[in-house]
């Protein structure tokens, strides 16, 4: 039983060590960058640097940040197969996309070579 707990802990540590942080800035009535490529376990943080209240809503992924006042931020940890489009429901012209997968970055590098 102890060996199983140790193995689970080591796997969790390895997973956490490879997870990345991605930052999306909300400013000028836009999300920047508009497209983020990430892996399962990565964290996306949206930071509101605009002078208006915004939110981050992804119906397909089943989340809504709630209202983010200027200076506030919100985080979401990505799961496998969780690519999604999102928007600010207060300002629907503000949109973005997060693509989640282990091979996204590799495939993009190959296509630009």
Predicted regions and their residues:
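Positively charged n-region of N-terminal signal peptides that target proteins for export
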Residues: 1-5
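Hydrophobic h-region of N-terminal signal peptides that target proteins for export
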Residues: 8-18
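Extracytoplasmic copper-binding redox domains, predominantly the cupredoxin/blue-copper superfamily
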Residues: 17-113
């Amino acid at each position: 039983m102890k060996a199983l707990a140790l193995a689970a802990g080591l796997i969790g540590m390895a997973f956490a060590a490879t997870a990345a942080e991605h930052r999306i800035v909300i400013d000028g009535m836009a999300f920047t960058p508009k497209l983020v490529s990430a892996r399962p376990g990565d964290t996306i943080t949206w930071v509101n640097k605009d002078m208006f209240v915004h939110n981050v809503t992804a119906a397909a992924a089943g989340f809504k940040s709630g209202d983010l006042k200027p200076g506030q931020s919100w985080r979401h940890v990505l799961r496998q197969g969780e690519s999604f489009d999102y928007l600010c429901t207060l300002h629907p012209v503000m949109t973005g996309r997060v693509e989640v997968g282990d091979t996204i970055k590799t495939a993009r590098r190959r296509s630009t070579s």
